[in-house]
């Protein structure tokens, strides 16, 4: 699977942008998914709607062009948006056949809060390596 990583920088956050990158990259290495694009939204943009944040336009263009199969984020909480906005993003990505994966816990992030099983062989060492 080809992946796109998205990271949201926040000034008062538990993870720096660098730590988020490490979590996502460790997950990609463990799963052997190549990363075709890394996108970042700078601190201060987390109050904006997801669609207006840096990187989101590029993400949706890449999705429409079939450049990836999966979006990798630390987890849903690190997108800093409400559930309706998250549902909209997930639905838009699924329209293009892109699923969203939470690198922190190894779970797929799906509309309606559905949870799929953790991928076989995936454990918390990806996350625990930072703490």
Residue ranges of predicted features:
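Short, structured surface patches at the beginning of a domain
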Residues: 1-131
């Amino acid at each position: 699977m080809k992946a796109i990583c998205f990271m949201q920088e926040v000034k008062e956050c538990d993870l720096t942008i660098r730590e988020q990158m490490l979590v996502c990259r460790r997950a990609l290495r463990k799963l052997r998914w190549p990363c075709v694009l890394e996108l970042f939204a700078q601190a201060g943009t987390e109050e904006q709607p997801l669609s207006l944040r840096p990187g989101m336009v590029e993400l949706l263009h890449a999705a429409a062009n079939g450049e990836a199969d999966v979006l990798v984020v630390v987890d849903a909480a690190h997108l800093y948006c409400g559930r309706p906005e998250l549902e909209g993003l997930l639905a838009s990505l699924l329209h293009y056949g892109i699923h969203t994966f939470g690198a922190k816990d190894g779970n797929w992030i799906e509309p309606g809060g559905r949870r799929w099983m953790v991928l076989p062989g995936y454990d918390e060492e990806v996350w625990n390596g930072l703490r």
